[in-house]
Amino acid sequence: MIGILNRWRQFGRRYFWPHLLLGMVAASLGLPTSLNDSQDITSLPNSSSSVSRQNNVSLSLTDLVALKEAHRRSSYSVDYWHQHAIRTVIRHLSFALTTPQTVNAQQADELEPHSLVLLDTLNALLTQDSQYPLVISPRAGRVTFYPQAHHQVGIWLAQIRGIRAGPSLLS
């Protein structure tokens, strides 16, 4: 009985949890939709240079770059488990980039741009600063920066909407 439990634990540690984390990162980045919408790389004509294949990979990954730069939600930030999943994917991809010597150079060149762009995007997700909301005041015509203004609803109403309750001067 103990042997069965130990084997199940080893299976979970080696196979189940890494694949679950990879799936979480892929689902959060939208990888299945962005890569399935592009042409199949193997259906491209085989040329002496892999320029056409590299162009196709870079075109299919433009959605990832746009997703990285997009402002999804004002309170969007990567939480601990998301960071853990992204770090696991980066680790798996970095091990996958170290190709064995038996693989020829052309196959390694075809896989490298896709993996490098994906690593760069995941690293940017980990190192990005959380984006705070910027409010443009219609009266003053200037951009006002509010760091963590979630608990300052009264101040926001007073400055932006002109609704005031309490003293006219904030000390």
Curated annotation (Swiss-Prot):
Function (record text): Regulates secA expression by translational coupling of the secM secA operon. Translational pausing at a specific Pro residue 5 residues before the end of the protein may allow disruption of a mRNA repressor helix that normally suppresses secA translation initiation.
Species of provenance: Pectobacterium carotovorum subsp. carotovorum (strain PC1)
Q: Which domain of life is it from?
A: Bacteria
Please give the GO cellular component terms listed in this UniProt entry: cytosol; periplasmic space
Instruction: Please tell me whether the keyword Transmembrane is annotated for this protein.
Output: no
Give the protein's recorded name. Secretion monitor
Q: Which gene encodes it?
A: secM
Keywords on record: Cytoplasm, Periplasm, Signal
Q: Which GO terms describe its molecular function?
A: translation regulator activity
Q: Show the taxonomic lineage.
A: Bacteria, Pseudomonadati, Pseudomonadota, Gammaproteobacteria, Enterobacterales
Which residues fall in a coiled-coil region? Answer: none
Task: Give the matching Pfam families.
Answer: SecM
Its family remark reads: Belongs to the SecM family.
What broad class describes the main subcellular location of this protein?
Answer: cytoplasm
Compartments where found:
Cytoplasm, Cytosol; Periplasm
Query: Where in the sequence is the signal peptide annotated?
Result: 1-36
